[in-house]
Structure formats: structure tokens, C-alpha cells
């Protein structure tokens, strides 16, 4: 760890909040592969941007092929993957944006660390359990990953040969086999409004 770095003062969070007219937070979507996390994240990002609110989505496409391209899928690498995502997401939240993350993030301890990281910085962290029965996720299987996992082609696949630890007390619990993508995005939006993280835009 570098020890010769000086932390330079910057705009305070409250000053940024006043200038941008919105609070920052991290919306952390967690759930099985094919549960609908990325689809909901895209819909939520579009909804917020259409209302002239600052939002940015972090997912496998812009993390695994860039910042975390050196990581595999061992438990150690998964932990480091989530640690880095937590740090980046915190930076977006600190800039008074709604940072939307959509990762399986299967281990409860990693998600708790992400929450603690935000709490220590005085930033809001909203954990959302994107829930779907395993059999429904397997029926969806848009990338054919469950099929490969069942065949043994993919090792350590969450939900099949590796564990998924469901949140115990998420801020929101969405059943995507019972609600549409649009309904899920709207529920999250209303939560952010009700918690006074963002202002309601018509």
C-alpha cells in the first residue's frame, strides 16, 4: 500500500449535493444469473436519466472487460471483484449520482462489506434482492450458462455448483417472475423518492 500519498481536500459532499440538486447512493442489485438484474438496471438507469437525474450503471460488460479483466471466478477472485466494484460504486455515489450495480455478488459477507464501506463514508446503500426461482432462471438461461453448468462445462457456477447466499434484510425484494421489468424499475424509483434520495420528476 502506498504511504506517500496526500489526501487533498475537495468539494464537500453537501456542496456537491446542493450544486447537483440530488443525493447520491448505490443501488446494489443481487441475484442469480438470469434473475433480471441487468435488465432492471438498464431500465432504471434510463428512467432516471430521462428525468434529468444523474445515474450510472456498473455491470459485467463494463467491469469484467476493463477494470477487473485480470480476475477469474474463484472465490478469491469473486471477492476481489466485488471489493473493487464497491469502491468504484462508492465514488459514483460520492459524486451525487445514483450508482446502479448489477452483479450476482453471491456472498453475503462481500455485500455487507460494500454496505459498511458506504456507511463509513456517510453514503446510502440500497440492497435489492432480484429474486426468481432457480427453475425459472434455468428456463430463461439467455447465455446458455445453466446448461453448461449442468453438463459440467462451467465449474463453480452460482446456484448449481457454487452457493448463493440470499440477502437477509434487503431494502427491496423483487420477484421478477411476478413483476415486469418496468414495474421493478418503478418500484426502485419510488423507493428513492420516498427516501428523499432523489426528487420526484414528472
Swiss-Prot record:
GO biological process, one term: cysteine biosynthetic process
Enzyme class (EC, first level): transferase
Keyword Ion transport: no
CDD domains per UniProt: APSK (cd02027)
Signal peptide (residue range): none
Superkingdom: Eukaryota
Positions of the catalytic residues: 105 (phosphoserine intermediate)
GO molecular-function terms, A-Z: adenylylsulfate kinase activity; ATP binding
Catalysis performed (reactions): adenosine 5'-phosphosulfate + ATP = 3'-phosphoadenylyl sulfate + ADP + H(+)
Gene3D superfamilies noted in UniProt: P-loop containing nucleotide triphosphate hydrolases
Pathway named in the protein's UniProt entry: Sulfur metabolism; hydrogen sulfide biosynthesis; sulfite from sulfate: step 2/3
Keywords assigned by UniProt, alphabetized: Amino-acid biosynthesis, ATP-binding, Cysteine biosynthesis, Kinase, Methionine biosynthesis, Nucleotide-binding, Phosphoprotein, Transferase
Amino acids binding ATP: 31-38
Entry keyword annotation includes ATP-binding: yes
InterPro entries, sorted: APS_kinase (IPR002891), P-loop_NTPase (IPR027417)
EC number(s) recorded for this UniProt protein: 2.7.1.25
NCBIfam families, per the entry: apsK, PRK03846.1
UniProt record similarity statement: Belongs to the APS kinase family.
Function: Catalyzes the synthesis of activated sulfate.
Record-given protein name: Adenylyl-sulfate kinase
Species annotation: Saccharomyces bayanus (Yeast)
Name of encoding gene: MET14
